[in-house]
Amino acid sequence: MADKMFAGLSFEQVVERYNQTVVSVCVMRLKNWADAEDCFQNTFVSLYSKKPELMSETHLKACLIRVAINECNNYIKKNKRIVSLENRKDEAVEFPLDETDISWALLELPDKYRQVLYLHYVCQYKVEEIAEILEKNPNTIKTTLKRGRDKLKSIYGGDLCER
């Protein structure tokens, strides 16, 4: 590929460094490996088609997460009217990553909780950073975190998400 630079990294280095993060976001959002692969590829195609800007690695990671979420949302909207004969809950989702118990538990939650809890506990973003990525008020993120933790506790019990 051409010598475009993103936050001082070549495109290949960006893909290598952030592929697991983008795959995880896509799988968490879509709950289907094949669909997640499509959105994963579209995320990096979208990044490459943009003009490289001077940005920090942190900003680049946040940008990739936001683009991945948008790609997944667009995919869901596009395929919303297609009736699936498969029951997606019965479909096995395989991750090429070493996922923690919390990552698997998040798959049981509705999207609005899953995204916020994933970004907070797995990606270790602060509330303010999540608010910026998802373009929401920090207080909304705090409320969503609390409600998501409560839902996890009701499903699994105990101190699964105490931090």
List the predicted regions and their residue ranges.
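DNA-recognition helix of helix-turn-helix
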Residues: 69, 134-158
